[in-house]
Amino acid sequence: MAAIRKKLVIVGDGACGKTCLLIVFSKDQFPEVYVPTVFENYVADIEVDGKQVELALWDTAGQEDYDRLRPLSYPDTDVILMCFSIDSPDSLENIPEKWTPEVKHFCPNVPIILVGNKKDLRNDEHTRRELAKMKQEPVKPTEGRDMANRIGAFGYMECSAKTKDGVREVFEMATRAALQARRGKKKSGCLVL
């Protein structure tokens, strides 16, 4: 039996951990060096609830220089991973300011999973000290959940690509959301207008 194919697009601020999350999930290795992304595609097989799903993973660049390029990734998307970094309250602020309006414009009705990346840094002393200098602190789980409710996300997950904690669960939730999203339409997904 052929695998079901679904397309996942990951968005969020530059350096918030999108590419690492995809690489750890698809290749099981953590890249130690930061390389800003233009577009990279991976395919990963995942089984959820007894269904084999071939997940096409579309990476995107969060930097503003790519704001005009990024929409090319959106057509026919089945699920969006919208990421912020737990060590960057500013990246959480950009979820309702930038990412939600962009995604809802290009991908109306596509389920969104809000993902808090870099969970391992929440209790990291160095991270806490650096944030304290700016009168900030790491994002709390309740703040992530509240934001997910505010933007109407399908769900909220936290993970650490570095420790692999929660990584698989993020993609399992995303796959379930993509499978449920076939609400009787022939072709769900995004339009570029």
Curated annotation (Swiss-Prot):
Q: Which gene encodes it?
A: RHOA
Identify this protein by name: Transforming protein RhoA
Which residues are reported to carry the modification Phosphoserine? 188
**What role is this protein assigned?**
Small GTPase which cycles between an active GTP-bound and an inactive GDP-bound state. Mainly associated with cytoskeleton organization, in active state binds to a variety of effector proteins to regulate cellular responses such as cytoskeletal dynamics, cell migration and cell cycle. Regulates a signal transduction pathway linking plasma membrane receptors to the assembly of focal adhesions and actin stress fibers. Involved in a microtubule-dependent signal that is required for the myosin contractile ring formation during cell cycle cytokinesis.
Q: Which SMART domains match?
A: RAB (SM00175), RAS (SM00173), RHO (SM00174)
Q: What is the lineage of its organism?
A: Eukaryota, Metazoa, Chordata, Craniata, Vertebrata
Q: How does it assemble?
A: Interacts with ARHGEF28. Interacts (via GTP-bound form) with RIPOR1 (via N-terminus); this interaction links RHOA to STK24 and STK26 kinases. Interacts with RIPOR2 (via active GTP- or inactive GDP-bound forms) isoform 1 and isoform 2; these interactions are direct, block the loading of GTP to RHOA and decrease upon chemokine CCL19 stimulation in primary T lymphocytes. Binds PRKCL1, ROCK1 and ROCK2. Interacts with ARHGEF2, ARHGEF3, NET1 and RTKN. Interacts with PLCE1 and AKAP13. Interacts with DIAPH1. Interacts (in the constitutively activated, GTP-bound form) with DGKQ.
NCBIfam families per the UniProt record, alphabetical: small_GTP (TIGR00231)
Q: List the disulfide bonds.
A: none
Question: What species is this protein from?
Answer: Canis lupus familiaris
E.C. designation(s): 3.6.5.2
